[in-house]
Amino acid sequence: MRIKILLLVLPFFAFASEHGGVNYDIIERALNFLLFFGILLYFIAKPLKDLYQSRIDKIAGKLESIQEKLRASKLKKDDALKRVEEAKLNASSLVETARKEAVNLAQKVKKDAELEMANIQKSFKDQKDFEERKTTKNVVSEILNDIFASDSLKVDQKELINIILKKVG
């Protein structure tokens, strides 16, 4: 620092020679200025450095807090992305499960419908057979009542069977 000041002041000494003219007190003024500037710098340097350092620390603190917020937001973003991926996997498994359940339910409904149809057909066949037997029984009973009601008609067994077969058939 002293060398810089000396180099700065050296040209003043070189040009400050007297020419036999008016005596200017440039050297004294320059020395007074340098001395004043040096004292001023001595007293103000530490507060200026402290002020500058506090500003640097303040900016560094803000930068650190911003970086911390950025890290936290990145963590939240990563967590949200993980949850989205889990939700996608969960949704696809739910869709697959729903499809399987729908297929199983459709098969069960089809099987139940087939069983119900078979039961209805069996019931219809049984009812039809019952009605045929009932009708046959009524016809035979009617014929027999007609035959036994009339005394004049004497029929042997073969004729009776033929008559019944004609009525039924």
UniProtKB/Swiss-Prot annotation:
Keywords: ATP synthesis, Cell inner membrane, Cell membrane, CF(0), Hydrogen ion transport, Ion transport, Membrane, Transmembrane, Transmembrane helix, Transport
GO cellular component, one term: proton-transporting ATP synthase complex
Organism superkingdom: Bacteria
InterPro entries on file: ATP_synth_b/b'su_bac/chlpt
Principal subcellular localization: membrane
Role of this protein: F(1)F(0) ATP synthase produces ATP from ADP in the presence of a proton or sodium gradient. F-type ATPases consist of two structural domains, F(1) containing the extramembraneous catalytic core and F(0) containing the membrane proton channel, linked together by a central stalk and a peripheral stalk. During catalysis, ATP synthesis in the catalytic domain of F(1) is coupled via a rotary mechanism of the central stalk subunits to proton translocation. Component of the F(0) channel, it forms part of the peripheral stalk, linking F(1) to F(0).
Listed name of the protein: ATP synthase subunit b
Organism expressing this protein natively: Campylobacter curvus (strain 525.92)
Taxonomic placement: Bacteria, Pseudomonadati, Campylobacterota, Epsilonproteobacteria, Campylobacterales
Designated gene of the protein: atpF
